[in-house]
UniProtKB/Swiss-Prot annotation:
Task performed by this protein: Sulfurates the molybdenum cofactor. Sulfation of molybdenum is essential for xanthine dehydrogenase (XDH) and aldehyde oxidase (ADO) enzymes in which molybdenum cofactor is liganded by 1 oxygen and 1 sulfur atom in active form.
Transferase as UniProt keyword: yes
GO molecular function: lyase activity; molybdenum cofactor sulfurtransferase activity; molybdenum ion binding; pyridoxal phosphate binding
Name of the protein in question: Molybdenum cofactor sulfurase
C-alpha cells in the first residue's frame, strides 16, 4: 500500500481521471446544458438521495401548469366534453406507461394507486390466498429477505388467512433449483402462490436477475420448485425503474408496482400496479367504490363490476390531474436524456467512480475509511444500480454513527439518506444484526427512523448515497472531498492495489437498448354477404371529398382511388394536443380553416392557411428513420398506432392554434377494425375515422333540411341558409349523391357507385360539430336544432359505408358523375 499526498487525491477527483475509467457521462453537450437550466434551484446543493426521490425539472412543472391553465379537465366519471378530455388524456398516459416498459394493453393493464405501497396492498387484498386443507396444500407467500417493508407487510394480510410464509435469501433462490420432473399430481395442483422480489435493492442497489420471473413461474427455482401449484411473481420495480430500463415483454412479471416520484420527482402520492392480463383473472376484489360498478342494487347483494380491469380496481375518482402530469414527465425525461439506457449508463458511471474512490480511501494508519455494503465491485451494470451503501469508520476501525455523519453533511449542504431505509432484511444481513439485536435495540429505545445510530457501539443503520439522471460529476467531487476533509485521519492514504484492480475492468454495457414494439393486428377484406331489393330511383355521385387530416378542411376532387381503409389518404392524419389527445372542431373549431392538399405526384401532404406560408409533410413516413417518434393515441375508444410528423409542422400548427400541438399519422402497417354493423363478415380496416370507411349524404336530404331551417326564421335571416354548398360542407361527407327523395338513403342496405360495391353500415348520428361554419369557424345552433325537429327528435343525417371488394383485388377509382344504384334494406328498422 503506497502513501500518497492529499494532492494525489485531488488529482483523483478530476474529470480527466473519471473519464479515464471509461465511464459514460451526460447526454451530449446541448442536453447537459439544458439539464443545468432545469435544476437551477439546487445550485450549491449536493443532492444524493435519488433513491428516496429524484428531482423534478422545471420544464415539467411549467408544462403541466401551462396544460391545466389552457385546458378544462373535468371528472372522468362524467360525460361532458371536459370529462371526455380527461378520460382520453388519462388513457393516453396509460399507453405511455406501457410503452415505457415495452409492453402493450394486450398484455398488461395499468391500475393507478396512491403509491407503490398502495399497489402492494392491492395485491395483498385481492390475491386468491388459499388456506391449507386436507385435500390441497395452502398458498405460500414467499419473499426475498432483501425486500422493502411494504412487501414484507403483505405477511400481515396472509397470516389472518392461514397462509404459509417463506422468506428466502438470494442464494437460496439460485442454488436450490429444481432437480426433478413434475409428477401428475403436481401438474394438476392449482393452488396459487406468490413470490415477491425487488428488481433492485433499495438498500444496496444490487440488481436481482430478472430471469427469476420465468424461473419462478415455471417452477424451476426455489421455493417454487418445492411447492407445487400455480406460482405468480410480484416484481417490485419502484427503485429499479428510476435509472434502468425494464422490458416486460422479456420478463413478464405478473404484478409490477411502481412509484412515479421515483422516476420524475413529481407528482408525489401517485403510483401504479401493472398487472399482466392473464394474471388479472385470479384477483378477487371485495370492496367496490364509485366508478367500479357496471350495476348494483342497494336492497340486494347484487353487484356486477365493470369489465375493464382498471375500472374495476380504481375505486372512486382517480387523481386525474396528477396522472395528466405524467405525460409531461415522460416527455421531459425523453427530451433531457434521450432514453433510459442513457440514464442507466450515466448514473452507473457516477456510482462506480464514487465507489472506486471511496473504497480506496485509508486513514494514516492504513485502515479503510469506509465499509461498503455490496455484493460486487461495481463492474457490471446488470448487477448493480446507482446506489452506494456504507458506514464510515474512524482510524481505529470503529463505526462513526450515521446521525453524526448526517449532521456534518448538512453543514456542507450535502443531502444523503441514513438508517435502514425500510429494508430490515438487508440491513440485518450487511450490518450483521441478529434477530436478538433488533429486539434488544428496540428495548434500548431505538425504533426505525430515529437518530439512535449506535447501540453498545454497534451500528443500527448505515449511510446511502444514490444518483439520478441529473446528477453530475461535481456531486461526486463534493461528496468525496467532504469525506476526506471531515472523517479521514491525515495524511490520507490511497489503496493503490485496490484502485488499480478496480480501474482495470471496464463496466459492462447493457446487452441491448430498449425499443418499443408496435402492436400489430391482422385484418382481411370484407365481402358481400347480403342481397336486397333494387331501388328504382336515379342517383349520381355529385361530389368527392377527402379529409386527409381529421377535423381539418376538405380536399375536393373529381376522381380518387380507394385504398384498403377507404378513400386513399382519407383521415390518416390528426392533430393532437401536448398530451396526445386528438383535437376536433368540438374543442378547436379553427381546425376547419386548415386546408390540406394531397399531392400524389410529389408524395406530399400540403397544409395551408389563408395568409400564411404553406407547409408540407411526406405522405408516407420512412419508418427506418432513427429519430421517428411513435406513440399510441385513441380514436372513439380504439387504440391507434401513430408516428409523429416532426417539429416543423408542430410549430406551424401550434402558432396558428395558439397552443402546443402536433401532427401525427397512422402507422402504415397498423390496421384497425370497424366495430359495428358487420355481422359475420370479415373485418373492415379503418383509418383514423370515427366509425366507418365512408360517409355518404344525399343532396335531397340537404335541401329538405335547408328549407326547414329557412322556415324557422324570418326573411332577414333566411339568406344565411340559402347556400346549399355551405350546408353540404358542414356535414363533412366523403360522398355526396343526388337521389330523388330526401332521406331515401336511410332505407338502403347496399349500393353500387360505378362498378364499386358498398355495404351500408348504419346511420350517422350528428353532434354539435355540424354547427361549425366550415368557412369561418364560427359556431351556430343550426342546423342541429332544425335537424332534431324535422327528424322527430333524431339527429341522424347520412349513412356510413364499407367498401366490399374481392380478396387481392385492385383498388378501384371513384369519379363524380358515376351512377349510384342502391338496394333497399329488407328491414327499415335495421339501424
Amino acid at each position: 500500500m503506497d502513501t500518497r499526498s492529499l494532492q494525489d487525491f485531488q488529482d483523483l477527483c478530476t474529470f480527466d481521471v473519471f473519464k479515464s475509467f471509461g465511464h459514460y457521462y451526460g447526454y451530449g453537450v446541448d442536453q447537459q446544458a439544458l439539464i443545468d437550466q432545469e435544476f437551477k434551484r439546487i445550485k450549491g446543493v449536493t443532492y444524493l438521495d435519488h433513491a428516496g426521490t429524484t428531482l423534478f425539472p422545471e420544464s415539467l412543472i411549467k408544462g403541466f401548469h401551462d396544460d391545466i391553465s389552457r385546458n378544462v379537465y373535468g371528472n372522468p366519471h362524467s360525460h361532458n366534453s371536459s370529462s371526455r378530455l380527461t378520460h382520453d388524456t388519462v388513457e393516453s398516459v396509460r399507453y405511455k406507461i406501457l410503452a415505457h416498459f415495452n409492453t402493450s394493453p394486450e398484455d398488461y393493464s395499468v391500475i393507478f394507486t396512491s403509491g407503490c405501497t398502495a399497489a402492494l396492498k392491492l395485491v395483498a387484498d385481492t390475491f386468491p390466498w388459499k388456506p391449507m386443507s386436507n385435500k390441497e396444500p395452502g398458498s405460500q407467500f414467499c419473499y426475498l429477505t432483501d425486500n422493502h417493508t411494504s412487501v414484507v407487510g403483505i405477511r400481515g394480510a396472509t397470516a389472518l388467512q392461514g397462509v404459509g410464509t417463506i422468506s428466502v435469501s438470494p442464494r437460496e433462490v439460485e442454488t436450490r433449483a429444481r432437480n426433478k420432473t413434475q409428477t401428475n399430481g403436481e401438474e394438476e395442483c392449482s393452488t396459487p402462490h406468490l413470490f415477491c422480489y425487488p428488481a433492485q435493492s433499495n438498500f444496496s442497489g444490487r440488481k436481482y436477475s430478472l430471469s427469476y420471473v420465468k424461473g419462478i413461474q415455471s417452477q424451476q427455482l426455489y421455493p417454487a420448485c418445492e411447492h407445487h401449484g400455480q406460482w405468480f411473481v410480484l416484481l417490485d420495480a419502484a427503485c429499479f425503474v428510476s435509472c434502468s430500463p425494464l422490458d416486460l415483454s422479456q420478463y413478464p412479471a405478473d404484478f409490477v408496482p411502481i412509484s412515479f416520484y421515483k422516476m420524475f420527482g413529481f407528482p408525489t402520492g401517485l403510483g401504479a400496479l401493472l398487472v399482466r392480463n392473464e394474471a388479472a383473472e385470479v384477483l378477487r376484489k371485495t370492496y367496490f367504490g364509485g366508478g367500479t360498478a357496471a350495476a348494483y342494487l342497494v336492497e340486494e347483494n347484487y353487484f356486477i363490476p365493470k369489465p375493464n380491469l382498471a375500472s374495476r380496481f380504481e375505486d372512486g375518482t382517480i387523481s386525474f390531474l396528477d396522472i395528466i402530469s405524467l405525460h409531461h414527465g415522460f416527455e421531459t425525461l425523453q427530451k433531457l436524456t434521450g432514453s433510459m439506457t442513457n440514464i442507466q449508463l450515466h448514473t452507473f458511471g457516477l456510482a462506480r467512480y464514487t465507489y472506486t474512490v471511496l473504497s480506496c480511501l485509508c486513514h494514516s494508519n492504513g485502515k479503510h475509511v469506509a465499509q461498503i455494503y455490496c455484493d460486487n465491485d461495481f463492474q457490471s451494470i446488470a448487477e448493480q444500480g446507482a446506489i452506494i451503501n456504507f458506514s464510515l469508520l474512524d482510524c481505529h476501525g470503529r463505526t462513526v454513527g450515521y446521525s453524526q455523519v448526517d449532521k456534518m453533511a448538512s453543514l456542507f449542504n450535502i443531502h444523503i439518506r441514513t438508517g435502514c431505509f425500510c429494508n430490515t432484511g438487508a440491513c440485518q444481513h450487511y450490518l450483521a444484526i441478529s434477530n436478538q439485536n433488533v429486539k434488544s435495540n428496540l428495548h434500548a429505545g431505538h425504533i426505525c427512523g430515529d437518530n439512535i445510530d449506535l447501540v453498545d457501539g454497534r451500528p443500527t443503520g448505515s449511510l446511502r448515497v444514490s444518483f439520478g439522471y441529473m446528477s453530475s460529476f461535481e456531486d461526486c467531487q463534493n461528496f468525496l472531498r467532504f469525506v476526506v476533509n471531515c472523517f479521514v485521519d491525515k495524511p490520507l492514504i490511497l489503496d493503490q492495489t485496490k484502485l488499480a484492480k478496480l480501474n482495470s475492468a471496464a463496466p459492462i454495457e447493457p446487452s441491448s437498448s430498449y425499443s418499443p414494439s408496435p402492436d400489430r393486428m391482422a385484418v382481411s377484406e370484407v365481402t358481400m354477404s347480403k342481397d336486397g331489393k333494387k331501388d328504382g330511383s336515379s342517383c349520381t355521385l355529385t361530389n368527392l371529398f377527402i379529409f386527409p387530416v381529421k377535423s381539418c378542411a376538405s380536399f375536393e376532387v373529381t376522381e380518387w382511388p380507394l385504398g384498403p381503409q377507404g378513400l386513399l389518404y382519407d383521415r390518416l392524419w390528426m392533430v393532437v394536443n401536448e398530451n396526445g389527445v386528438c383535437l376536433s372542431q368540438k374543442r378547436e373549431p379553427k381546425l376547419c380553416l386548415i386546408q390540406p392538399v394531397v399531392c400524389l405526384a410529389a408524395n406530399t401532404l400540403k397544409l395551408q392557411i389563408s395568409g400564411s406560408e404553406a407547409i408540407t409533410v411526406p405522405l408516407d413516413p420512412s419508418l427506418e428513420k432513427s429519430d421517428l417518434r411513435t406513440s399510441q393515441s385513441k380514436v372513439c375508444g380504439d387504440r391507434v398506432q401513430t408516428v409523429d410528423c416532426g417539429e416543423e409542422v408542430s410549430a406551424w400548427l401550434s402558432e396558428f392554434l395558439g397552443k402546443p400541438c402536433r401532427l401525427i399519422r397512422q402507422r402504415p402497417e397498423f390496421l384497425r377494425d370497424m366495430k359495428f354493423g358487420q355481422g359475420d363478415c370479415c373485418p373492415t380496416p379503418l383509418s383514423l375515422v370515427n366509425e366507418a370507411q365512408f360517409l355518404l349524404i344525399n343532396r335531397a336530404s340537404v335541401c329538405f333540411l335547408q328549407e326547414a331551417i329557412a322556415n324557422r326564421y324570418n326573411s332577414d335571416n333566411e339568406e344565411t341558409w340559402r347556400d346549399t354548398e355551405q350546408l353540404v360542407q358542414r356535414f363533412r361527407a366523403n360522398l355526396v349523391i343526388s337521389a330523388q327523395e330526401p332521406f331515401a338513403e336511410d332505407n338502403w342496405s347496399h349500393l353500387t357507385i360505378g362498378n364499386t360495391q358498398f355495404q351500408v353500415i348504419g346511420k350517422c348520428g350528428r353532434c354539435q360539430m355540424i354547427g361549425v361554419d366550415q368557412k369561418t369557424a364560427t359556431r351556430t345552433q343550426e342546423p342541429l336544432r332544425s335537424l332534431s325537429e324535422c327528424r322527430s327528435g333524431k339527429v341522424t343525417f347520412g349513412v356510413y359505408l364499407a367498401h366490399q371488394s374481392a380478396r387481392n383485388s385492385t383498388h378501384p377509382v371513384l369519379s363524380i358523375g358515376s351512377h349510384v344504384i342502391p338496394k333497399i334494406s329488407d328491414s327499415t328498422d335495421k339501424f
